[in-house]
UniProtKB/Swiss-Prot annotation:
Annotated signal peptide: none
Localization annotation: Secreted
Tissue spec. comment: Milk-specific; major protein component of milk whey.
Coiled-coil residues: none
Native organism: Camelus dromedarius
Gene: WAP
Gene Ontology biological-process entries: antibacterial humoral response; innate immune response
GO molecular function, one term: serine-type endopeptidase inhibitor activity
Major localization listed first in the record, in broad terms: secreted
SUPFAM superfamilies for the chain: Elafin-like
Record's protein name: Whey acidic protein
SMART domains: WAP
Keywords in alphabetical order: Disulfide bond, Milk protein, Protease inhibitor, Repeat, Secreted
A UniProt-annotated Pfam family: WAP
Domain of life the protein comes from: Eukaryota
Amino acid sequence: LAPALSLPGQAVCPELSSSEDNACIISCVNDESCPQGTKCCARSPCSRSCTVPLMVSSPEPVLKDGRCPWVQTPLTAKHCLEKNDCSRDDQCEGNKKCCFSSCAMRCLDPVTEDSFQ
């Protein structure tokens, strides 16, 4: 097993680039579904993949409770025309988290551990 990231700061997904491929490929659901040392990040408006995160120094990292709600992804790829509202939790108000919402990244209310089935 690879060692855990032990760098000071907060691991964040890189900002999306307009040059990213718009293919709808979902290769991860959340950080826990990725190899150690990577995060599940949006790579286009409708794709997610395990990516080496950027480390940003933050005197008080934003740690929001809960997880993103589970989203049923379509079985067939569709071109997504929606724009992302966020790329990181700290871009969302209150306790909302930046989550994939079938086509784009949105600030959504998190689900708590006891609401998992």
